[in-house]
């Protein structure tokens, strides 16, 4: 028995929600360890769709403990809204099935405003990142700048005013420079006071809770958000998110040691998608790209933005395997490729007349890198709903084997539809 870390191996939207839900049935605790409510996923359980952005997937399953770790930035308004939305669907979230790190950073209205102001200014200058405008980046900036308001501060009203003063000294200076009106101390205090009673009952010392449960033999599932290629260090900077999304962050973002992580499962889409700005070497602007987008329903859960689509990039996923220490992958959306005459896989790039096996970190070089493809025969048969290798066409199996060889990691699970049971299990990560 081992713990399992789930990470996206591409630019997010790999289908982590379904896989995490599938694994959460085997877990006792599900932990979010980074990001905020800027990346969502949809779970389909007994025909009912649940859209989650901040809450861990385990919250919709009875008998599971959902945990939001210290590495997450929490918008209390979004948290409360998500809890209320689930309640309307018959899912009750209480302190018995949700615990939140006392040292997690809060996203406030001023963070959301600053995010939007910057994106608008960047749009005018042609330098926008394509954020979700939800305040994630500014909140992480305050965390690193040691001026953030944290969950525990809601319980200490005596020291809160001084912390708000420190926060506003920074933010009002920024706002003056941007030509925006200053924010009053009272406005922030009122905002915090309005959410304290709803948030504080969930507060806990998470590192202690997880260490205690680990020692008792609990199975812990760490649920990553976004994807490796959006990591603040290892992604396509500056078109990245504001946190580390790689597996190592599961330790830092929860308070557990790296030795507690166990099996690293990389969720990997059978083709490639990206939302927003940034390099995308295998992007397809043709009929095939449109086919993938329509067949794969490639629209963001949180923003509704249309995703850019392209061929599978084995060179990028190979980097993700290395950066995360991926043990095995869950290959998703294989069924979307049904019916294509041929399939291409990127195995490297050409840059300045030379062939290279990885995407450079330089933004200028990324723009110049051209994909090198191999071509495989497609298949006409349907793979939708397949639950065993015997149900897959020979060419589909060949495609899967080629992916394994090129990325240097085996397929542990294979997903053939959005339904959780339409999954071919090769290796149970909890039993590896």
UniProtKB/Swiss-Prot annotation:
Q: Name one GO cellular component term.
A: cytoplasm
Could you say which residues bind IMP here?
13-16, 38-41, 132, 146, 226, 241, 305
Q: Name one GO molecular function term.
A: magnesium ion binding
Cellular location(s): Cytoplasm
Q: Organism's domain of life?
A: Bacteria
Task: Provide the binding site for GTP.
Answer: 12-18, 40-42, 307, 333-335, 415-417
**Catalytic activities:** IMP + L-aspartate + GTP = N(6)-(1,2-dicarboxyethyl)-AMP + GDP + phosphate + 2 H(+)
Please describe the quaternary structure of this protein: Homodimer.
Q: Which family does it belong to?
A: Belongs to the adenylosuccinate synthetase family.
Descriptive protein name = Adenylosuccinate synthetase
Point out the gene that encodes the protein.
purA
């Amino acid at each position: 028995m081992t713990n399992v870390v789930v990470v996206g191996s591409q630019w997010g939207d790999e289908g982590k929600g379904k896989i995490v839900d599938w694994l959460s049935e085997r877990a006792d605790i599900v932990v979010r360890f980074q990001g905020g409510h800027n990346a969502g996923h949809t779970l389909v359980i007994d025909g009912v769709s649940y859209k989650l952005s901040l809450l861990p997937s385990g919250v919709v399953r009875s008998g599971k403990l959902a945990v939001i770790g210290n590495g997450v930035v929490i918008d209390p308004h979004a948290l409360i809204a998500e809890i209320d939305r689930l309640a309307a669907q018959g899912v009750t979230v209480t302190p018995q099935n949700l615990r939140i790190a006392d040292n997690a950073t809060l996203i406030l209205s001023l963070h959301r405003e600053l995010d939007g102001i910057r994106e608008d200014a960047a749009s005018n200058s042609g330098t926008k990142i394509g954020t979700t405008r939800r305040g994630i980046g500014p909140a992480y900036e305050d965390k690193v700048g040691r001026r953030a308001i944290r969950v525990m501060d809601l319980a200490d009203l005596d020291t809160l005013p001084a912390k708000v003063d420190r926060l506003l000294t920074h933010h009002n200076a920024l706002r003056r420079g941007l030509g925006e009106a200053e924010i009053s101390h009272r406005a922030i205090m009122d905002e915090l006071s309005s959410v304290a009673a709803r948030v504080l009952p969930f507060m806990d010392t998470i590192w202690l809770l997880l260490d205690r449960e680990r020692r008792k033999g609990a199975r812990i599932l760490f649920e990553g958000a976004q994807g490796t290629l959006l990591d603040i260090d290892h992604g396509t900077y500056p078109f990245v998110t504001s946190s580390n999304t790689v597996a190592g962050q599961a330790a830092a973002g929860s308070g557990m040691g790296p030795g507690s992580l166990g099996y690293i499962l990389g969720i990997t889409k059978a083709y490639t998608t990206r939302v927003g700005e940034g390099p995308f070497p295998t992007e397809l602007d043709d009929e095939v790209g449109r086919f993938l987008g329509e067949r794969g329903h490639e629209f963001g859960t949180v923003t509704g933005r249309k995703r850019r689509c392209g061929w599978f990039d084995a060179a990028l996923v190979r980097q993700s395997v290395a950066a995360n220490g991926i043990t095995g992958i869950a290959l998703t959306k294989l069924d979307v490729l049904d019916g294509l005459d041929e399939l291409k896989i990127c195995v490297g790039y050409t840059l300045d007349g030379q062939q290279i096996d990885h995407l450079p970190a330089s933004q200028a070089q990324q723009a110049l890198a051209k994909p090198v493809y191999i071509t495989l025969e497609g298949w006409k048969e349907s793979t939708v709903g397949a639950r065993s290798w015997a149900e897959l066409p020979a060419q589909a199996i060949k495609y899967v084997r080629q992916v394994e060889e090129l990325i240097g990691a085996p397929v542990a699970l294979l997903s053939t539809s959005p339904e959780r049971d339409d999954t071919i299990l090769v290796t149970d990560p909890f039993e590896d």
